[in-house]
Curated annotation (Swiss-Prot):
GO terms for biological process: alanine catabolic process. It comes from Lactococcus lactis subsp. lactis (strain IL1403). GO terms for cellular component: plasma membrane. Pyruvate binds at R15, K71, H92. The gene is ceo. This is N(5)-(carboxyethyl)ornithine synthase. InterPro entries: AlaDH/PNT_N, AlaDH/PNT_NAD(H)-bd, CEOS, NAD(P)-bd_dom_sf. Belongs to the AlaDH/PNT family. CEOS subfamily. GO terms for molecular function: alanine dehydrogenase activity; N5-(carboxyethyl)ornithine synthase activity. It comes from the Bacteria. Homotetramer.
Amino acid sequence: MKIGLVKTNFPGERRVPLLPKDIKDFKNEILVEEGFGKFLDIDDQEYIDKGCHILSRAEVFSESEAIFSLKLIQPTDYPYLREGQMIIGWTHPFGSGRLFMKEQALPKKLIVVDLDSNSPCIYYENEIFESGIPKGLLYKNSFYAGYAGVLDALLQYGFIPTEETKIAILGSGNVAQGAFSSISKYSSNIRMYYRKTMSIFKENYTKYDIIINGIEIGKEDDPILSFSEQKSLKKGTFIIDVAADAGNTIEGTHFTSMDDPIYENDGKYYYVVPNTPSLIYRNVSQDLSKILSENIFSEDCSRFLSIKS
């Protein structure tokens, strides 16, 4: 299968998901957009030496059966998408990619292979299929999201916590673990809450100075912090949503960006940057490339078409 890799044009994104050193005996033909590896100082010739074809962005879209885009494809690329084309990457169909699914994936009958860190699935014509991709494959990326996101949030906010700072972390998964690993360098006054102890958080949430969210709730679930509950938070409370579950886990929040990462509302501060692993893109690119090479690019991606049979 012809797989096209395009440079992500998602704001602030710098990760390079395929490095030349990891291209070995691929069963797919790889088409790469010119300048693909520029953030890591990788020349196009290094991809050519590994058997890849270097093309313009428009040519990659037009000649590829499948497009790999690390982050959600942006509206400027919508005209390039062809009916029945395969899209591989982090699409977040029920989150930030909801509009993409409605306006592009469904009308154009796109086959969307979503690389969700916990349960990678294939989305096609309002149906969801098992992808065969191992679950939890990209857990390190989620860990880095929590780790780097918390560091960035604190620096952008201009505050390093002390033992007097009361900190709550929602969740116990990879994102929450990364957040804990990061913020515990500065304070041990931390309480982690998960599903069984969330009722205790509800009894104490107004006491915290920093609330870190590492949970992405389901589309039918109630928010963990509603509008009314947020009003009860003390002035200056800092909410760091490293799960980037905008508007869901923390009701009414909206995405922020690396250029403008924090906003204030009613005396509370919110950080909801959706691609925090890119803050440490040099580390993350190494892990991503190895894992994606072994589990996505090396095997013929036409296997994902079996859902249509």
